Amino acid sequence: MKRGGQPEHYSIRTASVFLGIQIQCAQCHKHPFDRWTKADFDSFTSFFRVSRMATLKGEDARGVRNDYHKVSVYLGPSERFAGKVKSTPPKILGGPLVPYVEGGQDPRIVLWEWMRSPDNPTFARSIVNRIWGHHLGVGIVEPLDDFNQAVPPSNPALLNWLAKDFMAH
């Protein structure tokens, strides 16, 4: 996957890096070892269908390293394909559909707010597992980016305690 890829790439990468969830199998069929379905994949990918890569220019590009001149830009609701393409409403993995976003707000902000919410331990568990794995050579869940029903944490109580402490600070 490369920067500037398709929305599906952003969906797969975001789930893996920030949530420790592998959903790429669900792009075509139900995940063989986990609960994720094609509908879950399509709904999660909808968070990323409203953006494209754009190049920073002028004042915006000053002081930015060359390889970071491309950024993701929110396009806003599109009228171009209204009524022509069936769209899937954004849905948080394992969570509810995201209600209509008021005022043209980027739905990725809604996703980010959910990811870092104290009500959602998934992000915190994934991050503390990565930090643990980086410093100690092995994660509490291995591989680091594959929390699933078939691979339980080696020490669930420790993982939960670290995640709660991470969220508190």
Q: What is each stretch, according to the model?
A:
Residues 1-169:
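Primarily short, surface-exposed interaction patches in extracytoplasmic proteins
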